[in-house]
């Protein structure tokens, strides 16, 4: 007996030596001891040591805290010397979470996991299971340790059942599911009737309870572990039990009861009865057309169609479908819609926005024609009485938009009096499915103006006169604001998108470099020099392109002509209309004998002068001068020039009043004579002011013009 305590004392002494050899991290003085089990040999205080140790066999370093007590010599005695304490008792790991043991939470309270995997909870992340009373939710068990045991109980509201779907399953497989498994019972306890056990990784079909609760048990043995499982559940109603047969659809009403919507061929409360199968007879294709099966099961023996068959109808060329394009075989054995017919018709021809169309009453051909009467006169009265006299009946029906019946007539006219029509004024739908005549179009009436009394032309508003402006930012000097616009010359509007102008107006001086389109603009409908006077009537248009004549010589100003393409169409009105183009052969008299009217603004006018606001478009009459005399006049002024074949010189007509200084306007020259389209006089463009030397605007000096007549073909090619 006396020797029996020596082994115990020796073991305790060895433990103390072992503890003293371990590194001490820190010591915490706690005024309250953790519990009665630690009060043996404890005095008024209780301290803790944090210990690091290495688990046997795993070489895994873990930590924990142990309490210690002060002895009579004020030394801290580890409580490991007491019975029941072993150094590796708490050498644990967090199998279902992340390590997080701190101070006494690790050893005393057992909380050594900072965060648990989904489905696990507790300080050691080993607790699982729950009682659930929600309409829907999920059960997720992420991974699992050995020898785990978890239970869940799901409760639904009275009158509802529970549907459980296992969407992920990863457990140890066994044919009997006796190692790792999920067990579902129809009730609220482990004694309820078992529905089935599940293991492996094959997801089962949805599970439904017969009552308002389900019990789920998870169990794992001590050999293997996998990823766990994930299930979702929800409360369901009477329809969830699939009371409708043959793929019928269950529909709940407000009272909680249900009705079944049956598929084709079934009837009854639960869609349990089979209807007698019905078919639709083949409707055939329309005359001058055909049909195709475009949906459903199709025809039976080529004569009958099953329920749901869809037919689509088509017409031959020059015929149009009137009626239902598609028909479906219905439950009652009848086709939907009405049988369509194919009608001879014409597609409406496309017209521009400038053309107005009117549909005239159809003129149906009959036997009451002069030819028929002549033919009938050769026969007896008896034979004539036997001949049909009624007008033939045409297959009328509703046509889709954009089509017209046979013999329909369309009448065309221009929407504005400032346009004239080209093409046919009336077209008829022919039996060929085409329209008679030519497609109509409307073009602006050119060269027409009012209130011009020759030879006096002052104060006339020439509607084709175009003012060409240039932005001051592209010109050096002059004292103009950077964004200001100034008038550089005049041009002639020849159609809705084209203006003819002298080439030197839109190029840099002495060069063929074209000014940027953004630095130029065209103003139409202008009369006064001051823009504010014409504010309501003018149209300010942007330029999309500038086309110089390829042979333009900026030094001699030979072929000084260019075309401006407008970005937007000019709107025709009494103030804006184009001028006509003419070839030399169109002139009724010799060009040299023509009285030519020149119009333009004074581009050099000073806006600060008193009469600036009242200054208007000026015009006057000139006559063609001899080219040799023109050259000699300028040579006498010290300016040797050459008048080429693309130019003509002209001076003021002393017999006609004039308020224009031709050299200052950069204007246009026009002649009035009857045109080809109308015997009425029309104004035609014949010239553009090109160059001159005339500081005093005297009658003796001539101005050089670009002759427009030779460039008619080039202009028309670029007008398209």
Swiss-Prot record:
GO terms for cellular component: extracellular region. InterPro entries: CUB_dom, EGF-like_Ca-bd_dom, EGF-like_dom, Peptidase_S1_PA, Peptidase_S1_PA_chymotrypsin, Peptidase_S1A, Serine_Protease_S1-Domain, Sperma_CUB_dom_sf. Residues 128-236 form the CUB domain. It comes from the Eukaryota. This is Inactive serine protease PAMR1. SMART domains: CCP, CUB, EGF, EGF_CA, Tryp_SPc. It is found in: Secreted. Residues 278-344, 387-444 form the Sushi domain. Residues 1-21 form the signal peptide. Glycans are attached at residue 451.
